[in-house]
Each structure stands twice: as structure tokens, then as C-alpha cells.
Design a protein with these regions (language model features):
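Walker A/P-loop phosphate-binding motif and the immediately C-terminal alpha-helix
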Residues: 5-55
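N-terminal pre-Walker A segment at the start of P-loop NTPase domains
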Residues: 1-2
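An acidic- and aromatic-residue-enriched active-site/binding cleft used to recognize and process polar
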Residues: 17, 46-49, 58, 168, ...
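Generic beta-strand/beta-sheet core signal
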Residues: 44-47, 115-117, 165-168
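Residue-level preference for the first positions of well-ordered beta-strands
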Residues: 11, 40, 112, 161-164
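Conserved catalytic-core segment of NTP-binding enzymes
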Residues: 37, 144-182
Length: 182
């Protein structure tokens, strides 16, 4: 895969070869800084094997269980395949949640759109491994890659000023695809 996939929005991927260095924290703090400057920021958790982005925002939240039950990128992969790649059967509102509380993002009109890797509430966590094993990041042949399709559709819907991606630690297919494409 040599071609870059073009989005209209700047994309920043956060990566570390070693785990436990604060990559997710750096992603969240960068998003908050941008939001406090009045920017609309989409944060995507592509750490599919160890998702944690949604839980940072759910922690100490009155609606924590609701936030953790929002579907994520893995759920999109499965739903998209199940619906035979028909976007008319997909509701993108199911794959993110919005945070715009002034105490969090400031008073300049900034917003955060958080795309979890997968729904991680107590009900869905039982099916996590099963869902992850069925997720297919590549659709068909050629240039049809799930992150390309998903990010483009989310960009069209949310019109963010920035897209921040929290990738998985180490050398892996998702991280390689994200770095090569964006």
C-alpha cells in the first residue's frame, strides 16, 4: 500500500513502540488543548486490542455506563460487513460520543468527538474477543480499507478541525496502515 488516503482534515497519529509511556494520555491532552482553542476534534481509538480512550472520558462521569456502551470502530467493521457495505444501513451516530461540557473543553466553542475502539461496558465486554476476531480491516481487494472508509464518512458527518488517532503499541497491522495512509 503506497498511496496516501487523503482527508480534508489534518490527522495526527500517536504511536509508541513501547507500552506504558502515556500515548493515550498525550492523545487526550492534545485533544483537550485543541478543543479549548475552540476546535472540533475527533479522537479515534485504533488500539483495538487494548482500548482505553472511552474509559478516560467515562471516568467520574454521571453517564459512564452509557458512554462505555457506545459502539466503536470494531463494531463498525462488523456492522458494515453484515450490512454488505451499504452505508444506507449504517448510522454513524452509533459509533461516537460527544463531549462539549465547558468544564472540560473551555468556553471557546470547542468539541470532542470520541470514537471508541469497541463498546466496553459490562454487557458488551463479554463479546469483545469474539467481535475482535471477526473484525476485518480490509474490505475486498485493492484500496478498500476500513479506516479509509470510516474516517472519510466520519469527517463528512462531523466536520472536525483535527483528527487524532491513538494507535496500538508495537509493530502491528493497524499501526502500520495508519502511519502509511495518513
Amino acid at each position: 500500500i503506497n498511496e496516501k488516503y487523503e482527508l480534508n482534515t489534518p490527522v495526527t497519529s500517536f504511536y509508541s513502540f513501547k507500552g506504558g509511556v502515556g500515548r493515550t494520555t498525550a492523545t487526550v491532552l492534545s485533544a483537550l488543548l485543541l478543543a479549548r482553542q475552540g476546535k472540533k476534534v475527533m479522537i479515534v481509538d485504533f488500539d483495538l486490542e487494548a482500548p482505553g480512550l472511552a474509559s478516560i472520558f467515562a471516568n467520574r462521569s454521571d453517564n459512564a455506563e452509557e458512554l462505555l456502551s457506545v459502539n466503536g470502530f470494531v463494531d463498525f467493521l462488523i456492522d458494515f460487513e453484515f450490512n454488505k457495505r451499504d452505508f444506507n444501513k449504517i448510522n454513524l451516530d452509533d459509533y461516537y460520543f460527544r463531549k462539549n461540557e465547558q468544564a472540560l473543553v473551555g468556553s471557546n466553542g470547542g468539541e470532542l468527538f470520541i470514537v471508541p475502539a469497541i463498546a466496553t461496558n459490562s454487557e458488551n465486554s463479554i463479546n469483545y474477543i469474539n467481535k475482535l476476531s471477526k473484525a476485518n480491516i480490509r474490505f475486498g481487494l485493492g484500496k478498500d480499507y476500513a479506516p479509509d472508509i470510516f474516517l472519510k464518512k466520519m469527517e463528512e458527518k462531523l466536520k472536525p478541525d483535527h483528527i487524532l488517532i491513538d494507535t496500538r503499541t508495537g509493530i502491528n497491522d493497524v499501526g502500520g496502515l495508519v502511519f502509511n495512509r495518513y
